[in-house]
Amino acid sequence: MSDDTTQIEPAMAQETSPRANTRKVFVKTYGCQMNVYDSQRMADSLAAEGYVATDTPDDADLVLLNTCHIREKASEKLYSALGRLRKMKDARAADGKELTIGVAGCVAQAEGQEILRRAPNVDLVIGPQTYHRLPNALARVRGGEKVVETDYAIEDKFEHLPAPRREETRKRGVSAFLTVQEGCDKFCTFCVVPYTRGSEVSRSVKQIVAEAERLADSGVRELTLLGQNVNAWHGEGEDGREWGLGELLFRLARIPGIARLRYTTSHPRDMDDSLIAAHRDLRQLMPYLHLPVQSGSDRILKAMNRRHKADEYLRLIERIRNVRPDMALSGDFIVGFPGETDQDFEDTMQLVRDVNYAQAYSFKYSPRPGTPGADLDDHVEEAVKDERLQRLQALLSAQQYAFQDSMIGRKMDVLLEKPGREAGQMVGRSPWLLPVIIDDNKDRVGDIIHVKIVSTGTNSLIAQKLA
């Protein structure tokens, strides 16, 4: 799952008849797809309380920043944003008006009270496992409290969240995220997720199917299942047997209206036979897999506590491509992990050449407080990290462009997601996740049409519709 602090304002319902006491909320999302999903579920909770969305903080009564803690810059972005909001809140106060500021997500979980100390203008801090308590927390804020809501028991937050209204789901489009698993038990030495999201927890089949059916009923055609280690999902199936993600995908594929399935993010250790069989047999499962490896060096993989070797990863890729030859691979890489030598880095470059990625995310290592990696010695100099990252990204970019060029002349089905920038233009999604731009003024959002790729754009494909 990419954690490159993509910033998204999630769609929320707009009321059709404004009320005098309507409260407006602005939600900003930093980070991964799961944060986007969490923002949408918080939006559902707030909609049930009478909040309506605004696309700017300028006229909001409540501003929520849903944060990411994977990398240091994400925290820096949060405090920079809070500094700007402080000025806005002070200006409101001078006019006798109020602005409530809330911090949600993984930085909220990791820093808790520290956020209130560093940014006293914040009214509410709420973690990713406690946002089902958001309406109650806001009521306490209106009563004059400063609220930090990060302690959670073994309880199912999804049982406490209202189902999204059909009209709200429609506004979000024909592709949707659905969280099926949260937390992580792998404890990679560079990663904060086990400390901010907790242990691995799988949602029940009943919950997942019910939410997927609601989404399909609202016009969703493509579902992306989310989890920190999504392929670690397991649970009792409808037949009484223990299911893994493969069996769950087969069940979701039976839901009328769901034409496409994806999942992210996976761990190599949890790619089992049933999941590989799903890639072989399930036509709705798209041929695109995000499977992070982080390094091509066995020595660094061991230091990272990744629990697999580079050759095991490569053999797994071979197994997957044997059953799905058109599979496109995406990955994550960290350069400059403590102790990484020139040879370790060259091993990573060789693995990248061996796999030939369609897309990948790469970052310089930055120590995260509280992780074992932060206590390691032999840190790599920043200049060396920079040079290695440039070399790696150049190779990955070349592979990505080559993958896009390989699409030219191919025929494929494309799911139309939205109108394009130009009149009569539509933007869809290829099976390999790339946006596809088509001159088409007859088909509608949600249609799946057959096209031929004629050229490439910037991270996109240009297509002609086929009869």
Curated annotation (Swiss-Prot):
Residues the record lists as binding [4Fe-4S] cluster 2: 184, 188, 191
GO molecular function: 4 iron, 4 sulfur cluster binding; metal ion binding; N6-isopentenyladenosine methylthiotransferase activity
Keyword Ribonucleoprotein belongs to the record: no
Top class in the EC scheme: transferase
Ranges of residues in domain Radical SAM core: 170-402
Domain MTTase N-terminal: 23-143
Cellular compartment(s): Cytoplasm
SMART domains in the record: Elp3
Pfam families: Radical_SAM, TRAM, UPF0004
InterPro entries referenced in this protein's UniProt entry, alphabetically: Elp3/MiaA/NifB-like_rSAM, Methylthiotransferase, Methylthiotransferase_CS, Methylthiotransferase_N, Methylthiotransferase_N_sf, MiaB_methiolase, rSAM, rSAM_horseshoe
Claim: Transferase is one of the keywords in the record: yes
Reaction it catalyzes: N(6)-dimethylallyladenosine(37) in tRNA + (sulfur carrier)-SH + AH2 + 2 S-adenosyl-L-methionine = 2-methylsulfanyl-N(6)-dimethylallyladenosine(37) in tRNA + (sulfur carrier)-H + 5'-deoxyadenosine + L-methionine + A + S-adenosyl-L-homocysteine + 2 H(+)
Cofactor binding, per record: Binds 2 [4Fe-4S] clusters. One cluster is coordinated with 3 cysteines and an exchangeable S-adenosyl-L-methionine.
GO cellular component, one term: cytosol
Cofactor requirement: [4Fe-4S] cluster
Enzyme Commission numbers on file: 2.8.4.3
Keywords from the UniProt entry: 4Fe-4S, Cytoplasm, Iron, Iron-sulfur, Metal-binding, S-adenosyl-L-methionine, Transferase, tRNA processing
Annotated positions binding [4Fe-4S] cluster 1: 32, 68, 106
Residue intervals of the TRAM domain: 405-467
Segments for region (Disordered): 1-20
Subunit structure of this chain's protein: Monomer.
Family per record: Belongs to the methylthiotransferase family. MiaB subfamily.
Function: Catalyzes the methylthiolation of N6-(dimethylallyl)adenosine (i(6)A), leading to the formation of 2-methylthio-N6-(dimethylallyl)adenosine (ms(2)i(6)A) at position 37 in tRNAs that read codons beginning with uridine.
Name the record gives this protein: tRNA-2-methylthio-N(6)-dimethylallyladenosine synthase
